[in-house]
Structure formats: C-alpha cells, structure tokens
C-alpha cells in the first residue's frame, strides 16, 4: 500500500484554503493529497482535516457558517 501524504501545500506551493462562492452559497475546503488538489464539500471532512492538521485553523464561527450554508 502506498503512503498517503495529506497536507495543505502541494509541490508548487499553492496552499489549501476555505472558499466561498457568491450567488448560490457554496462553502468548502481545498487541500492536497500526494500533491493532487482535492475539493472537499462535507463539513465533517473539513473538521477531520482540522483535527489532523491543526494549522488549518478554522474558527468555530466559520465552521458554524459553513454548516448552515451546507444545509440549504
């Protein structure tokens, strides 16, 4: 089995980030696994990344806002 390297920075130095799309509300997170960008839409996954990588540093108020938007 190959090792999975979960991180918030890929080889080109572009960091993962929370994002919001105006118009139709859209919240999520972008991160990198083995240098490949992935988009994450589920808040539980975002929280999982937060537990694995504390430097993601998502505030509780942001988590609540994301949760609210995803229930729409």
Curated annotation (Swiss-Prot):
The record marks 29-30, 37, 60, 67 as: Interaction with the host cell wall. Disulfide bonds: none annotated. It comes from the Viruses. Gene3D superfamilies: 3.30.720.190. Changing residue 4 to A/D: Complete loss of PlyC holoenzyme formation. One of its GO terms (molecular function) is identical protein binding. Homooctamer. Part of the PlyC holoenzyme, which is composed of 1 PLYCA and 8 PLYCB assembled into a ring structure. This is Endolysin PlyC, small cell-wall binding subunit. It comes from Streptococcus phage C1.
């Amino acid at each position: 089995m190959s090792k999975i390297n979960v991180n918030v920075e890929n080889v080109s130095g572009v960091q993962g980030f929370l994002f919001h799309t105006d118009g139709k509300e859209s919240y999520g997170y972008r991160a990198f696994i083995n240098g490949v960008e992935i988009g994450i839409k589920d808040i539980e996954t975002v929280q999982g990344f937060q537990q694995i990588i504390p430097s993601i540093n998502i505030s509780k108020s942001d988590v609540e806002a994301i949760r609210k938007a995803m229930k729409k």
